Structure formats: structure tokens, C-alpha cells
Amino acid sequence: MTDVLPAGPGRYPAAAPASEALFARARALVPGGVNSPVRAFRAVGGTPRFMVRGEGPWLYDADGRRYVDLVCSWGPMILGHAHPAVVEALHSAAALGTSFGAPTPGEVELAAEIVDRTPVEQVRLVSSGTEATMSAIRLARGCTGRARIIKFAGCYHGHSDALLAAAGSGVATFGLPDSPGVTDAAAGDTIVLPYNDIQAVEAAFAAEGPQIAAIITEAAAGNMGVVAPRDDFNQRLAAIAHANGALLIVDEVMTGFRVSRAGWHGLDACPADLWTYGKVMGGGLPAAAFGGRAEIMAQLAPAGPVYQAGTLSGNPLACAAGLTTLRLADDALYRRLDDTAAVVGRLAGDALAAAGVPHRLSYAGNMFSIFFTDADVVDYASARTQQVPAFKAFFHAMLEAGVYLPPSAFESWFVSAAIDDTALEQIAAALPAAAAAAAAGHGG
């Protein structure tokens, strides 16, 4: 790797020859050149940066450039990159073997940590958030004997067929209503409603209540950009579901263990039936989980009739990284995340206001987004009013100044506890030029 180039606005050339060469090679080998669509930079243009190293708040690309990381691997890296305790835990676990296909002490310890921190009484470990939500829905259907599921437009629950209808995240990024390959039969039992609209939920149950197995919602929406639930929206979802014999599934894959020790539940104490987790609980490795009340979880095989399995579920390396991360994530760390997110958001908002750029700063705990719009953002429709060209210009100016943002206007920004004064100074120095670029790009 070449020496790190100096940080600061305008000091990074737009060209990234090593990343460009890697991307060209990747496109010949991997569809679109990436293994998850948003990484391709299609929403913002240009060449995706191929990262070779992370340390604390910093990412280093193949061209030797250093960036303050405000993506944090899409949420998991609350401690920052290569935290010494996590690295040591991984070294120790790997020395004992990387996978056994049998129960391990580590998965028991990780399950105990999750149960201790959250309202779930039992938890099943899996390898991805998609697996977690897919399995939770199967379990809800098995418990209720019903087929239909309510989800909300702009909420993303992984890429299983039934949940891609009007999804956020990559689907929002690419402007797709759903996905080819999803059959009418697979999507036919999914009812899609506007987010934050409790009257629409009441109407759906009035029309089809006896067929509805569950409502699934993000604890706080983070995949159409960050949109917090209004008032007591989540609690009212629980009340409506329970009054009609249905279950409430709260998707905390993104918020879980990021916004508080107990995830979003630590902020609103919503009485759901099932919860899904991921991202932070793996400490940067592939791990996820779903859990809930013991009588519901008892319906899972081998204890019950609802089948779910996974070859690498409870992988010892993922459990070691996740358990170490969670044990380091105390109340002081969450205060630091909250404070850092507030500072970064204020710096960005002040710069955009000074440049005359219409915007809305939207928080859910320490997750946040900037919507380039005059409109109040409360759901997917209002999120889509933003000026994407303004975000593109803003993104590239920040990238060239050494700040790595999510390469989509419809994603959350994430901070880590490793962000220090040096990193904040680099962000602050980058923002005026980026705000000016957004002003020039607005309406373009």
C-alpha cells in the first residue's frame, strides 16, 4: 500500500487508480463488481473505493487514502475498526478452530448476553439479518396458523421474497418497486402500508384481521434514510396486533445494541412478541438472531414443529467477536455514540444551512440521515422528495476530502466510539466545500 495521503478538503484527487483496477477485475468475476448492490456507487456515480484496512475511526483504501468512516460497515462497528480486544478474541477463537458443526460454549454465552440485555426470553442464532426476519415470519405464521404479513413501505427486512415489496435500503437506492424473480405467490401474502400511519393499520385489520399473522416493522426506520416512529406508533402496533390475535415483530437488526444497551427497546419499551437482531451483535462478523417469549420460541425445531436451521449458525469466531463487542458496549459507550452523532449532525446541518441548502436532519438515537428536502420526512413517500443530485455532489466532495459517507441518499450515517477530535476536525474541515457542492447540485 502507498503512503497515506494528507487529509483535508480537496486534497484527494477524484481518480483512484488502484480501486478502478480492482473494480474492473471484479466486474468480470462478480455481478456488478460487488457482493452487495449499494457498494457499487451506482446511486452516486464514480468508482467505489476498495478498502484494505481499518483502524479506529479510519478506513484506508487501495490507493493509500485515509477516510473518517461514517458508514461503520453499515452499523456494526460501534467500537471502531480493529479494536484490540476484538482482534485478540478472534485470534484466540481461531486458534481453537473456525467451525465445528456442533454446539459451542461461545454461542451459549452470546445468547445469555442477548437475553440479559433485551426483552427476549429465548434466542436463536443465525448468520444474517435476512435469515432472522425470514425465520421470525415463519415462526409467527406457524404460531398463529395465519398467512398474511403487514410491512411498511420503505422498511427493509432483508431480501427474502415476501419482504422485498416496497422495501428500503438497496431497493430505495436503485428506485426499484420490488425485484424480478419474486413471484406473485411469494408477495401475495404481504400487505404494504405507509410507515407511521396507524389508521392504515387499523383499516387493514378491519378488512383482513383473521388472516393476518403478524406486523413486522423496523424499530426505527433506517433504510429509507432514518425516520423515527411517531409518538407511540410502535406501542399502538403492538396493541392492534394483540387485539386481533396477531404478533408484532420488531426488526432491530440495525438499531439493536447500537442505540442503547437494549437497542430501541431501551428507548421505547414496546411490548412486541418477536425481535430480530444483527450487525452489532456480530462485532463485524456475520451473525444475527431472532428471539421472543419462551412459549413462542418453543415452537421452533427441535423443540417444536416450525423448522429452521443453519450450518454456520453460532459460528465460534462470530460469537467471540460479538460477545467481546457487547461486553464492551456499556452505558458510557452509548453516551459517547449519542454525543458524537449530535456533534457530526450539528456540524453538517450548520454547513448546509450556511450554504442555503434545503435539508432535514433526522435522528433515531445515534443513527441519523440528512434529507436534501424542504419537506418533513415521516415516511417513504416524503423521504423520496429529496434532491438526490444534491446528495451526490455532497457525497463526492466529502469523499475527496477524506470522509466516507454511505453512497446512497437513502441510508443511515453511523458513528463509532473511536471517532476522536482529529476525526471530527477532518469532518468539520470537509463540510463547507461539500455544502457548497450540494448547493450547486440542488435541482440538478
Curated annotation (Swiss-Prot):
GO terms for cellular component: cytoplasm. Pathway: Porphyrin-containing compound metabolism; protoporphyrin-IX biosynthesis; 5-aminolevulinate from L-glutamyl-tRNA(Glu): step 2/2. It is an enzyme of class 5 (isomerase). Gene3D superfamilies: Aspartate Aminotransferase, domain 1, Type I PLP-dependent aspartate aminotransferase-like (Major domain). The gene is hemL. Belongs to the class-III pyridoxal-phosphate-dependent aminotransferase family. HemL subfamily. Keywords: Cytoplasm, Isomerase, Porphyrin biosynthesis, Pyridoxal phosphate. This is Glutamate-1-semialdehyde 2,1-aminomutase. One of its GO terms (biological process) is protoporphyrinogen IX biosynthetic process. The modification N6-(pyridoxal phosphate)lysine is found at residue 279. It comes from the Bacteria. It holds the Pfam family Aminotran_3. Its EC number is 5.4.3.8. It is found in: Cytoplasm. It comes from Salinispora arenicola (strain CNS-205). InterPro entries: 4pyrrol_synth_GluAld_NH2Trfase (IPR004639), Aminotrans_3 (IPR005814), PyrdxlP-dep_Trfase (IPR015424), PyrdxlP-dep_Trfase_major (IPR015421), PyrdxlP-dep_Trfase_small (IPR015422). Its cofactor is pyridoxal 5'-phosphate.
